[in-house]
């Protein structure tokens, strides 16, 4: 009862307080009406534009207005832009020394959109385009319910715009902070061993508004610690982390409005090598979900007044040409060659009906332009010792439309192309016979790399199969190769014509790669304007065109990127027969090697140049061996549509595979003593160091006996029958070649023979180390065959038994002590392998 009374008393008290407050409010209001000066309660929620944006504010007009007042930045976002996709691209503008990253390189890329939230808030979502349905379809609601995009930021609406059709939000803390949408990704921070953001040392440098984009420049400092001495760095260690305990980056974030109407998609075709994007498409009338895969390319459209000319086949200029600017930090003498590498693509665009479609230009002296601005495509020049260049692009994920590209050009790529050109052509081009090329030669090397990387930014993938469509003997035909080039595609890793012999007298035009038949055809496929907005109808038009052209010209074949088992599609190779091409290449390497002491000589050099170029010779020799190796157990893959004749998969012909095995016996397993010239090696190579020639021999032998290759040979023979190499034939050919005269084998051959027996032992009795290695390969996506219960193990045992018999016969006629010891050792190893104790 006491509790009830207490509660009742409390209720009465609360009611009195509420009524008292009401009375005060009424009294205050009455007093105000009578002229008494009383303060009104503060107004909550967004203010009007006049109340919030003062005369002190500095305003920029753009895709949305940017206001700066009282040291804060505000975005004024029109309601019409809510729900519109924008792409946010964050790049390094300046980086800490030793980071192995460079100003202009991309940090992060997100598709975002703004939307109204509850309680007067504006949300930013990151859009992940996984699936899509037409909004008029009933299933569109189910798709929307299944794929909710994450909210990555929430902003209070501080005020409404002048006409109340926009929302003003404070973005200061968002850009100063560490939100992944406009900062380093978690992966990048782990890579640099960074911890928390130091907010007191992070700030906004500037925000600039443009008609279709906003550019935000920020400085961000992260706390960091160096790894303990002797411990692994666990990433990309930055010296500043050890010196200062912090790392500072200057970043540029471009927020670019995507087109209201996406470009018409061109559906991906595996017979033409384009980068692609994709999403899952749903519709009410489907019986099977469709994965929409489409090519990545620029939008080229004729001006309305030129449309009829274009249809008649006249060359016309596109509404918006593709322009690449060269970084003003580029050494002046190389700028014309980089620009030429861009403009060289016009010959391909003419096949698609365009003139002046692509233009290389110097960076203008214009303070309104920024190298990091996402509206501009730029060749960025990096002061780096990295021997490389790369060609990325940023595209609209809805359509594949390329929006911009920042080509990465490392200063030391010149070292790479120098060594390539010298080791591949010095036998035939006197200009290649020195460690420092003249500017014209180096400029033309830069031009070829520029064209290759620009090709990537246009959407083109590597075509490693292109060079296989040139017969080897045509590479020595001066008239033909100077007119057509040694490969049909500059997107191949065909480098230079190493097949050409001195007596062929082929000039540089027959040694350098160029934009070829395939490149022109691929650009024609990707950039011909059909005017067709229906992707399926566009595909029908292009499919017939592809079939007709491939039937007429086999040089248009796209062979992929060398990641399968097709020997026609390899990196760094030439011609339609790897054995013949490599024999010519080795002839030239022999000519080059004997001249290296003279060609590498420079004042004060302590044989570093000779050592470097000897390594390049061995490396090139090793590449030739790898080209031949791919033929053994090779499977040809030629993508086709149902309208084309023939199979997609076929074995590498038996005769070619046997030729490869014979090549190894002649060029590799018979010790290549020409690479062991003591007069050269004694200048720089200590004999106790690892022998590079032996390393090449061992690597190829182990690859020939790799369980995955042997298993592939068995499955190919099962599928293709007599047209494929049989496993027992391959193993017999290898054993007979390797042990042709065991009693006279030199130390290199003896080491190889021991390796052979050890590899077969490993097939029969796999160790835990090899099994763990196989498991690791599977874990990272590489297939690894389980051969324990297959013919591979049976054949390995059979080969050891055959070898044991032949060794016993050789032993009877062997008198050399080293050879006898070797034979006895092999017999012991075989016995242990066949009957492990």
Question: Model-predicted segments: where are they?
Answer:
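Conserved catalytic/binding loops enriched for acidic/polar residues
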Residues: 467-837
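Auxiliary tRNA-acceptor-end handling modules of aminoacyl-tRNA synthetases
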Residues: 22-330, 348, 357, 363-414, ...
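Sec-exported extracytoplasmic/periplasmic mature domains
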Residues: 343-354, 455-456, 460, 496, ...
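The catalytic-center signature of Zn2+-dependent metalloproteases
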Residues: 37, 44, 362-382, 444-501
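Bacterial Sec-dependent N-terminal signal peptides
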Residues: 1-24
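Extended catalytic-interface subdomain
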Residues: 390, 395, 401-409, 450-458, ...
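Solvent-exposed, acidic/flexible segments
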Residues: 331-338, 439-447, 484, 614, ...
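Solvent-exposed, polar/charged alpha-helical surfaces in well-ordered, non-transmembrane soluble domains
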Residues: 336-343, 347, 448, 619, ...
């Amino acid at each position: 009862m006491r509790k009830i009374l207490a509660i009742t008393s409390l209720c009465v008290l609360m009611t009195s307080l509420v009524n008292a407050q009401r009375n005060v409010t009424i009294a205050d209001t009455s007093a105000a009406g009578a002229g008494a000066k009383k303060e009104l309660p503060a107004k909550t929620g967004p203010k009007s534009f006049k109340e919030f944006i003062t005369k002190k504010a500095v305003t920029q007009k753009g895709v949305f207005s940017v206001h700066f007042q009282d040291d804060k930045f505000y975005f004024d976002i029109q309601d019409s832009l809510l729900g519109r996709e924008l792409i946010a691209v964050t790049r390094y503008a300046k980086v800490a020394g030793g980071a192995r990253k460079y100003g202009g390189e991309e940090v992060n890329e997100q598709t975002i959109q703004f939307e109204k939230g509850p309680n007067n808030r504006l949300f930013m979502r990151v859009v992940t385009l996984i699936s899509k349905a037409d909004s008029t379809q009933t299933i569109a609601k189910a798709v929307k319910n299944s794929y909710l995009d994450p909210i990555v930021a929430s902003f209070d609406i501080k005020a409404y715009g002048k006409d109340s059709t926009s929302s003003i939000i404070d973005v200061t803390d968002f850009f100063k902070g560490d939100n992944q949408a406009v900062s380093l990704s978690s992966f990048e921070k782990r890579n640099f061993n960074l911890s928390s953001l130091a907010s007191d040392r992070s700030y906004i440098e500037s925000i600039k508004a443009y008609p279709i984009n906003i550019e935000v420049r920020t400085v961000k400092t992260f706390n960091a610690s160096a790894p303990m001495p002797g411990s692994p760095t666990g990433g990309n260690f930055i010296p500043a982390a050890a010196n200062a305990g912090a790392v500072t980056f200057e970043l540029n974030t471009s927020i670019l409005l995507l087109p209201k109407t996406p470009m018409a998609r061109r559906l991906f075709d595996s017979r033409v090598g384009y980068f692609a994007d994709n999403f899952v498409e749903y519709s009410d009338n489907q019986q099977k979900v469709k994965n929409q895969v489409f090519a990545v390319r620029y939008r080229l459209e004729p001006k309305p007044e030129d449309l009829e000319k274009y249809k008649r086949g006249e060359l016309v200029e596109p509404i918006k040409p593709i322009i690449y600017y060269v970084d003003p930090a580029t050494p002046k003498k190389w700028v014309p060659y980089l620009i030429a590498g861009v403009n060289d693509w016009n010959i391909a665009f003419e096949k698609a009906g365009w003139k002046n479609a692509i233009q290389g230009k110097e960076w203008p002296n214009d303070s309104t332009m920024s190298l990091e601005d996402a509206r501009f495509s730029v060749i960025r020049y990096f002061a780096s010792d990295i021997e490389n260049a790369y060609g990325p692009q940023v595209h609209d994920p809805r359509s594949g439309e390329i929006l911009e590209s920042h080509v990465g050009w490392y200063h030391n790529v010149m070292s790479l192309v120098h060594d390539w050109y010298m080791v591949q052509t010095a036998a035939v081009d006197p200009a290649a016979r020195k460690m420092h090329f003249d500017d014209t030669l180096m400029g033309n090397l830069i031009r070829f790399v520029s064209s290759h990387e620009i090709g990537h930014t246009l959407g083109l993938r590597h075509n490693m199969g292109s060079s296989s469509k040139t017969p080897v003997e045509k590479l020595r035909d001066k008239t033909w190769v100077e007119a057509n080039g040694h490969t049909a595609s500059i997107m191949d890793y065909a480098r230079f014509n190493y097949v050409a012999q001195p007596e062929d007298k082929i000039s540089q035009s027959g040694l350098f790669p160029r934009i070829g038949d395939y490149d022109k055809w691929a650009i024609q496929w990707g950039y011909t304007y059909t005017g067709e907005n229906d992707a399926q109808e566009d595909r029908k038009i292009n499919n017939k065109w592809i079939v007709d052209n491939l039937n007429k010209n086999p040089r248009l074949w796209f062979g992929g990127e060398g990641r399968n088992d097709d020997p026609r599609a390899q990196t760094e190779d030439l011609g339609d027969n790897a054995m013949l091409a490599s024999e010519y290449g080795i002839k030239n390497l022999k000519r080059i090697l004997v001249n290296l002491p003279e060609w590498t000589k420079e004042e004060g050099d302590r044989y570093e140049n000779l050592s470097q170029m000897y390594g390049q010779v061995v490396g090139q020799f090793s590449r030739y061996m790898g080209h031949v190796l791919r033929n053994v157990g090779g499977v040809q893959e030629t993508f086709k549509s149902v309208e084309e004749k023939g199979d997609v998969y076929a074995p590498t012909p038996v005769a070619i595979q046997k030729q490869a095995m014979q090549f190894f016996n002649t060029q590799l397993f018979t010790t290549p003593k020409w690479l062991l010239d003591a007069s050269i090696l004694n200048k720089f190579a200590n004999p106790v160091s690892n022998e590079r020639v032996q390393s090449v021999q061992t690597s190829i032998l182990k690859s020939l006996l790799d369980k995955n290759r042997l298993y592939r040979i068995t499955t190919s023979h099962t599928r293709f029958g007599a047209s494929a190499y049989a496993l027992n034939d391959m193993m017999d050919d290898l054993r007979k070649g390797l042990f042709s005269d065991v009693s006279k084998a030199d130390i290199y051959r003896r080491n190889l023979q021991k390796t052979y027996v050890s590899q077969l032992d490993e097939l029969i009795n796999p160790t835990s180390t090899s099994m763990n290695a196989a498991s690791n390969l599977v874990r990272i996506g590489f297939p690894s065959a389980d051969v324990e219960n297959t013919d591979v193990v049976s054949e390995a045992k059979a080969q050891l038994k055959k070898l044991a018999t032949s060794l016993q016969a050789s032993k009877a006629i062997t008198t050399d002590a080293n050879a006898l010891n070797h034979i006895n050792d092999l017999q012991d190893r075989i016995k242990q392998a066949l009957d492990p104790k």
